[in-house]
Amino acid sequence: MKFLLFIFTTILFSQSEITDSRNNAVTNSIKIASPAVASINVTQVQKYSINPLQRDPWFEYFFSPQIRQKEVKGSGSGVVISPDGYILTNDHVVENASKIIVTLPGGKEYNAEVIGMDNLTDLALLKVDGKNFPFIEMANSNELIIGEWVIALGNPFGLFDMNQQPTATIGIISGKDLDFGLQ
């Protein structure tokens, strides 16, 4: 009986050590940041011609172009950066969007409005109505150290819509103050 109690106690203690060792800076950061990750679903209206010959100027001279429209769905990721619903995402995700739906962990959906876009840096700022959103505070990128760990959370391929949790990956800061000619 004492032997079984010893084994049971040892197993519990070992399990506790394993659990404690798995809780580290990366897993804790993901736990803290995940509620602020947003899934961005967009609808874009794209125009197309129904006949490839319409691109020929001679054909268009005699026949008026017949342009059709279709809705195209797309998705991406964003992050809530303020408690009043400002969300940072990529310009290419929301470019030409006629409708933007933001989904937060837990499945709550919001209609979003584009506040600003910058094609050069591929950034866009969205706004959803509401208050007290979980958010991530922006830090000073000048304080980063080359080789420091970084974590990316997101919504590749719309996976967020299936399980309402962002995916995670890690890497390192590989460079700072790089000039890509963006002016």
Residue ranges of each PLM-predicted region?
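Sec-dependent N-terminal signal peptides
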Residues: 2-12
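Serine-dependent protease modules
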Residues: 15-183
